[in-house]
């Protein structure tokens, strides 16, 4: 557990943790608590978060398997530029959140790589951002009751997104009353699952 900054490059690790597995945490200062990961091969089993940063979490390259966690990736902001990431979580798979930060500091951005997320049953979200969601590239495969839950806006300009095997043409907020209609997409209509009970 590190307070301000953690940079991990070129390692091979297998981690079995009772709580958070890879963690950088600074509760006092939201401008630090940063984690940078590149060219690693990590296999993680966690009793709580697989990879946790109280600040910015940046993944540039490498292979990351979180085989068991409550939340797979958590950061104030999460930026994925590359790499191959596979997550199983019993709560949110990827969670961009920090109660002490401003909403404009909180976001999920995917520019490249592959992100596979499966979540357990219940009120769970494969990708949950307390701010904005931006996808410009890469491939996202989400398995769960929903896909995205965000409080800001969603921008989707490139890459491929699949939810439960179905290719998406826009990012739809699973939480009604969230951040407004992404891209002016309007209601989803009679998609799978139709009118929610």
Where are these regions (language model features)?
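A composition-driven surface/loop motif
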Residues: 1-197
């Amino acid at each position: 557990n590190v307070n301000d900054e953690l940079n991990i490059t070129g390692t091979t690790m297998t981690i079995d943790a009772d709580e958070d597995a890879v963690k950088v945490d600074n509760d006092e200062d939201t401008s630090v608590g940063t984690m940078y990961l590149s060219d690693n091969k990590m296999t993680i089993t966690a009793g709580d978060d697989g990879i946790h940063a109280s600040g910015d979490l940046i993944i540039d390259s490498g292979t990351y398997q979180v085989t068991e966690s409550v939340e797979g990736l958590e950061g104030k902001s999460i930026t994925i530029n590359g790499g191959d990431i596979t997550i199983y979580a019993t709560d949110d798979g990827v969670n961009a959140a920090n109660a002490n930060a401003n909403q404009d500091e909180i976001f999920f951005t995917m520019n490249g790589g592959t992100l596979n997320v499966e979540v357990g049953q219940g009120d769970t979200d494969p990708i949950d951002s307390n701010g904005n969601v931006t996808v410009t590239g890469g491939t996202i495969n989400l398995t769960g009751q929903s896909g995205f839950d965000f409080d800001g806006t969603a921008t989707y300009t490139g890459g491929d997104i699949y939810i439960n095997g179905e290719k998406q043409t826009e990012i739809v907020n699973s939480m009604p009353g969230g951040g407004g209609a992404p891209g002016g997409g309007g209601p989803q209509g009679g998609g799978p699952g139709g009118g929610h009970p």
